[in-house]
């Protein structure tokens, strides 16, 4: 019997890609706040060329998560996780929290100059 599909994988992938996309900019600020030296933080600049790829992965993963979570309830068979109203509401809440965090992470490089 196959496991019912949920939007968890896409949500996790989108969040991870957003973190990687902002690692070159958000990472140094967090590490400096934690007390790490600036010489080591310069190594995170290696991720900058891959930022567009990470942004694309984050947006695609969010799209698939949105599609999976907001599909018609009729597509769910009775007894599956997606047919339970409380679970659907929880997934929607988690989706919007992750989407907000992704947008913050993607927008952070543009507001970063205000922190330095």
Swiss-Prot record:
It is found in: Cell inner membrane. It is a multi-pass membrane protein. Gene3D superfamilies: bacterial mercury transporter, merf (1.10.287.910). Keywords: Cell inner membrane, Cell membrane, Membrane, Mercuric resistance, Mercury, Metal-binding, Plasmid, Transmembrane, Transmembrane helix, Transport, Transposable element. GO terms for cellular component: plasma membrane. The keyword RNA-binding does not apply. Changing residue 27 to R: Abolishes mercury resistance. Disulfide bonds: none annotated. Disruption phenotype: Merp-merT deletion mutant is unable to transport mercury into the cytoplasm and shows almost complete loss of the resistance phenotype. Changing residue 14 to R: Abolishes mercury resistance. One of its GO terms (molecular function) is mercury ion transmembrane transporter activity. Changing residue 24 to R: Abolishes mercury resistance. It comes from the Bacteria. NCBIfam families: PRK13751.2 (NF010314). Belongs to the MerT family. Involved in mercury resistance. Probably transfers a mercuric ion from the periplasmic Hg(2+)-binding protein MerP to the cytoplasmic mercuric reductase MerA. This is Mercuric transport protein MerT. It comes from Pseudomonas aeruginosa. The gene is merT.
